[in-house]
A protein has these predicted regions:
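Non-catalytic, well-ordered alpha-helical scaffold segments
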Residues: 13, 17, 51, 77-78
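Short, amphipathic alpha-helical interaction segments positioned at domain boundaries
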Residues: 78-100
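Minor-groove-contacting beta-hairpin "wing" of winged helix-turn-helix DNA-binding domains
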Residues: 70-76
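Generic structural signal for hydrophobic core residues of well-folded globular domains
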Residues: 23, 27, 84-87
Length: 100
């Protein structure tokens, strides 16, 4: 049972890292400070639990979200960028940007 829980936690951590990395890379590519990006595009064909992950990352201070109907726009915070450069959910103390 604990192996299953560990596996689920690892998957959750990978999803959280994925969201932050996508935001980080989009921010770098666009050169846009505090740009807003469609979370629906980030999640396309990948995950169904958008609200769950948005809640976690917003609560942790890594991103800010804005709901417009069933569309969610998100932006990475400076704290989120720093996290991408120094750590990750799936491998603490190993930067997300060096894992992908």
């Amino acid at each position: 049972m604990s192996e299953l829980l560990d596996h689920l936690r690892n998957k959750e951590n990978e999803h959280l890292d994925h969201i932050l990395l996508e935001l980080y890379e989009r921010e770098l590519a666009s050169g846009n400070m505090q740009g807003w990006y469609s979370l629906n595009e980030i999640f396309t064909g990948q995950y169904n639990s958008q609200d769950y992950y948005v809640d976690i990352l917003s609560r942790e201070g890594y991103m800010i979200s804005s709901y417009r109907g069933n569309h969610i726009e998100v932006t990475i915070t400076s704290y989120g960028k720093q996290f991408c450069e120094t750590s990750s959910y799936s491998q603490p103390n190993v930067p997300i940007i060096k894992q992908m």
